[in-house]
Amino acid sequence: MSRVLHPFVLAALLAILAPCVAGATGAFNQFVGLGDSTLDSGYFRYTSTGNASADAMVASAIVGGAQGGWAGPGVMTTTFLAARFGLSAETVSAGGTNFANGSAYTAPLSATAGGSAAPGGLSGNVTTTQQIANLLAATGGVANAHALYVVNSGNNDLIFVQNQGTAWIAANPTFLNGVASEFAASVATLQAAGARTIMVPNTFYTSTLTGSGGIVPASNIDDYARAVAYGMTKWSYLMAAGVRFIPADLTSVFQFVATNPALFGFTPSSVLSANAPSPVAALVTTWADITPVQLQTSLFVDGHHLTTAGQKIESDYETSLLTAPSLMSLLAEAPVQGGLARAAVIQGQIDLSGQHRGPTGVNVWIGGGVGALTLKNFSGFPDVSGTPFTGSAGVDYQMPFGLIVGAAFTAGTQTQHFSIGGGQFDQNDQAISLYSAYQAGPVWGNVVASYGWYQDKIARDVTLGLFTDSNSADTTGSSLALALRAGGDIHLGPVTTGPVAGLVLQRVRIRGFAESGTSGAQTGSNGVTALSFGEQIRDSAISQLGWRASIDAGRWRPFVEAKWNHELVDQSGRKVRAALTSATAAPYSMAAAPVQSDWATASAGTSYKISERVMVRGCASATAFDSQMVNYGGDVGVSVSF
């Protein structure tokens, strides 16, 4: 009897362990910042500016509360962004991997051909292109493929050109194009060395040029247009160089902030660079120059650099660009789990119909189920969790020689809530299935082929500081599935037990779609955080190997099954494509949420014979040993023979 009880005990153990899963791994294991003061988290706190007087001012400011970065005593966007993924944005001058240093140019700049070129506004600056070279030199020419690289450079290039005057600008119309070319070539070397996730913002410098209500004064129109064009040029040159990067449209985001200040806790005057509270540069701004309240209620510290509130808006936006594609990948993952559940229900009804068959050979059945499904993401990325509901109905016929053929219809619905940031997706699905089964002595087998279609309604909230931009979209999808299952029965008195093996093949297709957001009503576009997503295809081939047992106890027939599942299709290379809707830029791709390749499933239940023609069946199941998923639930059904 111990051999019979073994699968029951194993199944119960798996069910108990099912909710106990480990956390997901991180998408990134390092943060690397490259650029200027927009990213600098404290470079000159630990090294010289190249000017003794400036060094003394920095040292004094640190005593007064300054952090060494360019938000005064506030927090930099790099610190926020890295911390979101459990990483450090410590400056390279203190042993970290944030190479950015305030006042740096993209490349050495000179106003005259052949003239002495400067690395930035400070003699101690290191240009962005040199930062990349220094990084690769320090790593032996190999870039960390699992790092998050943010390359933000160009504001100081714009100021350099602006300071040369109208005549010089007219005489050197392609000057910034040349700088952009050097920038693109440098970032291309970073990618060639192995970097895979590279974010490149355009600029928020445009918001230092706007007046009340976000309107650009006539005196700043040329400078504003130049800043916008420079951002587009850098992206264009990166595309031409074959660099795969994530474009961050800070220009549109901060233009939206400037025109809607109240949404972010600002006033029409406190978003103006001219009204920045600090009388000194952000690098040396202390608590004597700015208050904690002003760091939250003003957009700029000193007219050029963002306060803590502004830095948080930027990091929130950039976080959304990084996490949205993998979050949307779960639109295709939920149907895979639904397909497994659908196949299991139909296979259970095949088993039930085999226990009673009327003189006509026809059985009709109906059933329904409810479960709990949590799909996990990378750490720091949103997970989803919800309650799937399903209902199925079918009819089958047993031919004189024993072959069973049947058809079923299944419908389901679920709302999957996002764990971070708010939002959800509602997924409705329908499927038509054809199935067949046959048993020859102790050996049995069945096959279920299904075609399904899906309707998704997505609501994705993006937090930008105090404001939440609610994006929404609708899309549809389809699936093909083939479930094969076979086994052998060993009869030990009232007990029937034996091995079971299966293979479930699925292809899920989710059509591409574009979001529209709350901010779109003010901008006349889709919105500043709205994205479009490309078509997704999720292929799955899951092998199953296990053992089952049942006991014939009169009208009751309790059963249990435990099996090991293995995903044969490598999911590590699956990516989801996304694109900005607020600006013209190349689409980018991010890895889909990770999927466990091995896990266990346990199920237990019973059938009950109400009469010679009517039987009912109930089953509960759960998964275990899957760090990326929590899945459990139950279903009940009734079968009538004719």
Task: Give the residues covered by each predicted segment.
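Short, Φ-rich (hydrophobic/aromatic) sequence segments
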Residues: 17, 340-348, 564, 620
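Bacterial N-terminal signal peptides
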Residues: 8-19
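Bacterial N-terminal signal peptides that target proteins for export
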Residues: 1-9
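Conserved active-site regions of diverse hydrolases
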Residues: 23-357, 370-378, 636
